[in-house]
Amino acid sequence: RPIYKINGLKSLNKKINSLFGNLMIGLEYIFKRTGPMTMGASQLCMFAKSDPSLELPDLQWHIQPMSMDTLGATKNHDFHAFTPTVSNIKPTSRGHVSIVDKDSRTYAKIKQNYLSTDNDRMIAAKGLKLTRKIIMESETFKKYSPEEYRPGININDDEELVKEASNYAQTIFHPVGT
């Protein structure tokens, strides 16, 4: 989940982090039926190919107007930023779910096994590089002076990018395998 700081445009981070901001979000919804409570987490979706020779896209982005270190576990950042989450929609890695014992109350063992194939690791690196290129080089984003917060502009090597991807890999919105 890469994160980009932005200037000249407000994200939801600061509003969500304050009691007053949350109150205003709630009141806007109650009285106007507009605002952040009327929308899904992702405001934009995009598809692309990690390799131009592919017949169909293998990457999907969900772009959220907010950022945090760990989804659902930490507060939003105290700066304005957005999160362009990139997913491999044709993964070759396979996880599994196993029954642990006969007791139905015992949680199953889940091995997610993200990024366990060379192909998936290569696509993860390509996805992060393409995200960076779109945000840092396109005219659309230049007026917001984006700064790469994560993985960090100094991380360029494919293996380093894969390591960063594995640090934040998670399932989102069922892009594949549901």
Locate the predicted segments by residue:
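Catalytic cores of eukaryotic secretory-pathway lumenal/extracellular enzymes that build
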Residues: 1-3
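FAD-dependent oxidoreductase catalytic-site/capping-region signature
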Residues: 6, 10, 16-178
